Regions:
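Beta-propeller-forming repeat regions
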Residues: 4-376, 380
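Short amphipathic alpha-helix adjacent to the substrate-entry channel of hydrolases
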Residues: 425-441
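Conserved beta-strand scaffold positions in the cores of enzyme catalytic domains, especially
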Residues: 10, 176, 235, 392-394, ...
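Active-site-proximal beta-strand/loop segments in catalytic clefts of secreted hydrolases
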Residues: 407, 420-422, 443-446
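Short beta-strand element of the alpha/beta-hydrolase
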Residues: 412-422
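A domain-start/cap signature at the N-terminus of enzymes
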Residues: 375-412
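Alpha/beta-hydrolase active-site loop
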Residues: 449-456
Length: 456
């Protein structure tokens, strides 16, 4: 089956407002139960939810200056956040990081009522990432957060996991487990959770930028959860020569049954992966600038995990890396001139594929890119035959003869070469392209002299 891909279409949820905070987090869920995905981000001294699919309705569900009166001085927007059904009532609540860690209870009428603000932990400081996982395997989700500041907290340069209390609405503190106790220096950023060593227990990886203001950074590492539940966990360094290290997520990218890591340098250049179990560092893309976000998912529907990221600057590129399932990645462009501090893969339009949701950071916007519709063409119309041993279809389009020859196995990205005249005059070139997985298409439009009709 041949898959034809169009361009990714950019949809704007929120254009951004100068001087009202920078959206650094993007999450989505169907909060009002109407069958359409809604979106949420943080700016303008609070958290705002947008109703899909047309985004014409929005509501600031919590205003920080009204909701919190403690010791911490909150900023105008969260640095990160995630979703979890904290109170077990069947809807997704928002967990945010803004000089402390908090959660917002989703009410019965999420676009009409305020979301109740409750503190999770105001002792840890510098939680650049919040992510959920069942850390202790009790069947309930926990929260993983970093306490990355070197001072101003009893838990400097650390990473913790937090257990939800039996009654989360009571104000009871969440149980804090400091598993990386002072051995996560520098500017620790984002965590990835997964069983790396195959012992059945989730482990946690993290990346940290370095430099003069963040001594001890420039590393990627993972912490091994011990079987006896003791603290702290054992640290395993993946690499300490990674300027701008930020994001890291675990998965098996080469099909050998061993966990690997995909990582980006959000305060530097490039994306790479670490091949398990030795964790050899393999460069994927050395040129992408400030890829300060990362998500994994099967973007092309071929059964293996791909990666997506976006640069943080105004001129950032949104890209995805197509995986062949054997450890090779091919960079594909999604969009340009879009910044990001957070990126999620979500089916935003209900068409059963993963779209890309982006919190715009310096662009101050919240946008999503629609995954191009995959049009199955099987078979092409017309007469079937063989050309040089390859399947060919001949048909007419606008009274012009057309031919399409399929490779035996399509190359990543399913590339095509088009011939506008003189079918078969360079058979050796066409054979070489087919052997490399390219489709060869022919349509005689030479008499249209490159006009728009010829392109069509």
């Amino acid at each position: 089956m041949t898959q034809v891909w169009a361009e990714w279409k950019k949809e704007v949820i929120h254009k951004g407002i100068e001087g009202r905070g920078i959206p650094n987090v993007a999450v989505a869920a169907d909060w009002d139960g109407d069958g359409a995905m809604d979106a949420m981000t943080s700016f303008d001294n609070g958290v705002t939810v947008f109703r899909g699919p047309d985004w014409k309705t929005s509501r600031q569900v919590t205003r920080f200056s009204d909701a919190y009166h403690g010791e911490r001085k909150l900023r105008t927007s969260c640095i990160h956040g995630c979703l979890m059904d904290v109170d077990g009532d069947g809807d997704l609540d928002f967990l945010g990081s803004n000089q402390l860690v908090f959660w917002l209870e989703c009410p019965d009428r999420p676009f009409e009522q305020d979301w109740t603000f409750r503190v999770i932990d105001e002792q840890i400081l510098g939680s650049h990432c919040l992510t959920v996982a069942d850390v202790d395997l009790d069947g309930k989700l926990d929260l993983v957060a970093n306490s990355g500041r070197p001072e101003g907290t009893p838990y400097p340069n650390s990473i913790v996991w937090l257990k939800v209390p039996s009654d989360p609405k009571s104000g009871t503190p969440w149980q804090r487990k400091v598993f990386a106790d002072g051995d996560a220096p520098g500017g620790s950023h984002y965590m990835g959770v997964g069983d790396v060593n195959g012992d059945g227990l989730p482990d946690v990886a993290c990346g940290a930028k370095g430099g003069e203001k963040f001594p001890g950074g420039e590393w990627f590492a993972w912490w091994e959860q011990p079987k006896d539940g003791s603290l702290p966990w054992k640290k395993h360094l993946l690499s300490d020569r990674q300027p701008g290290a930020s994001n890291i997520l675990p998965a098996d990218f080469d099909g050998d049954g061993k966990i690997d890591y995909f990582a980006t340098r959000g305060h530097g250049l490039g994306a790479l992966w670490f091949r398990g179990p030795s964790f050899e560092a393999i460069e994927v893309d050395s040129t992408i600038v400030n890829p300060h976000s990362l998500a994994l998912g099967d973007l092309d529907g071929d059964g293996d995990l791909d990666a997506a990221t976006c640069g943080s600057q105004l001129t950032g590129k949104v890209v995805w890396y197509e995986s062949d399932g054997q450890g090779k990645f091919h960079r594909r462009l999604i969009g340009e001139n879009q910044g990001s501090y957070d990126l999620r893969l979500v089916d935003m339009d209900g068409d059963s594929d993963l779209d890309v949701l982006v919190a715009g950071h310096f662009n101050r916007n919240l946008v999503w890119y629609a995954n191009p519709a995959k049009k199955a063409i099987m078979p092409f119309p017309g007469k079937a035959s063989l050309w040089q041993g390859y399947e060919m279809r001949e048909f007419s389009l606008d009274q012009r003869t057309c031919r399409v020859v399929r490779p035996k196995q399509a190359a990543p990205g399913r590339p095509w070469v088009w011939r506008a005249r003189f079918w078969g005059h360079e058979p050796q070139t066409d054979r070489a392209m087919l052997e490399r997985g390219w489709h060869v298409a022919y349509c005689d439009v030479a008499n249209l002299f490159g006009s728009p009709d010829a392109v069509r």
